[in-house]
Amino acid sequence: MKNTALVINTVFKNCDLWELFFGQLDKHFSKDIKRYVFVDQDDEKIPSDCEVVLYDKTKKYQEQFSSCIGSVSEEYCIYISEDYILYDDVRMDLIENYKNILDKNKNISFIRFIRGGVVDMGLPVYRYYENLYELSNRLPYFYTNQAALW
């Protein structure tokens, strides 16, 4: 998939999940997408096909992420964390459709892969796209650490 990267955010203290996480990722996610791992410490448990981008663990999350994202050259990022264990194949056709929606709707900056948040706010369906809902940036919990395309 052109111009798309997989950004995996993790921390070394969670390395006990990596074997399961990367094993399931290899089974269920396209190998045609470049993989970046944002982490505070490199380790041999991180597969060699991933580009490791180190951050300073003494910084706040926002600063950690900001210091790493500049290493990603692709136009689109699929964001996940190491605790997002895949149990089925990722529908790359949906991701391609979502990229097209982002291309056509410049007022959208990201699409979450989970409808949710802390409360159901009765959000409207976004411009006739099935299963997409508009989320105002004025609502609480506008930013959440969820799997997303941006």
What is each PLM-predicted segment?
Residues 75-87:
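Short beta-strand-to-loop acidic/aromatic patch adjacent to the donor-nucleotide binding site
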Residues 133-150:
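A recurrent flexible, glycine/aromatic-enriched loop bordering the glycosyltransferase active site
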Residues 88-119:
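Conserved donor-nucleotide/metal-binding helix-loop-beta segment in metal-dependent transferases, i.e.
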Residues 18-23, 62-63, 91-100:
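Well-ordered, non-membrane alpha-helical segments in soluble/globular domains
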Residues 15-17, 43-47, 86-89, 94, ...:
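Short catalytic/ligand-binding loop motif for oxyanion handling, primarily in non-cytosolic enzymes
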Residues 11, 81-82, 115-116:
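Histidine-centered beta-alpha loop that forms part of the nucleotide-sugar donor binding/catalytic region
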Residues 36-37, 77-79, 109-114, 149:
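A structural signal for short, well-ordered beta-strand segments and their strand-loop junctions
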Residues 1-57, 67-76:
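N-terminal anchoring/stem segment of glycosyltransferases
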